Amino acid sequence: MTNTENYFKVGTIVNTHGIRGEVKIMAITDFAQDRFKKGADLFIDTKQGRIPVKVQSSRLHKNMWLVLFVGVTNINEIEKYKGDDVYIEGTARPELEDDQYYYDEIIDSTVVDLDGNKIGVVKEIMETGANDVWIVQRDGQSDALIPMIDDVVKSVDVDAKLITIDALEGLLD
């Protein structure tokens, strides 16, 4: 996709599922149940350009979304999209509360401690029952798991992609 400015990646088609045209999508989005719900408008980013599709049905299966698009009836119609990314239009994103963020606003953000020392870069977000956990890649060390709670996360500057945390004792061990 040449211009992704008004589009947001929500997943990647990793494989087909069965012979009736379903695809397995590895979601990299918050609100996945809304992104892939029946009637949702998505765009497949192909080498030939962006192709609009509409979700006919979807379900979660083994941490992947199995999605069938309207008009697709067999594997031959969809197999060519294996490996392609799936996007939503930017206008499809609702406003969030002040202390809530979209994944793409957090991923690749630099994490620093209260003194401004770099800890690492957020590479992934893990959803847990209580709160999200940011997986921070550190240079020459194992990844740090940063819980998205008020006691730890002190500020998030989405525009600067900078997150300041209070590295509580034992958090970075």
Swiss-Prot record:
It comes from Leuconostoc mesenteroides subsp. mesenteroides (strain ATCC 8293 / DSM 20343 / BCRC 11652 / CCM 1803 / JCM 6124 / NCDO 523 / NBRC 100496 / NCIMB 8023 / NCTC 12954 / NRRL B-1118 / 37Y). It comes from the Bacteria. The PRC barrel domain binds ribosomal protein uS19. Disulfide bonds: none annotated. The keyword Acyltransferase does not apply. This is Ribosome maturation factor RimM. Its main location: cytoplasm. GO terms for biological process: ribosomal small subunit biogenesis; rRNA processing. Binds ribosomal protein uS19. It is found in: Cytoplasm. GO terms for molecular function: ribosome binding. Keywords: Chaperone, Cytoplasm, Ribosome biogenesis, rRNA processing. SUPFAM superfamilies: PRC-barrel domain, Translation proteins. Belongs to the RimM family. An accessory protein needed during the final step in the assembly of 30S ribosomal subunit, possibly for assembly of the head region. Essential for efficient processing of 16S rRNA. May be needed both before and after RbfA during the maturation of 16S rRNA. It has affinity for free ribosomal 30S subunits but not for 70S ribosomes. Residues 98-171 form the PRC barrel domain. GO terms for cellular component: cytoplasm; ribosome.
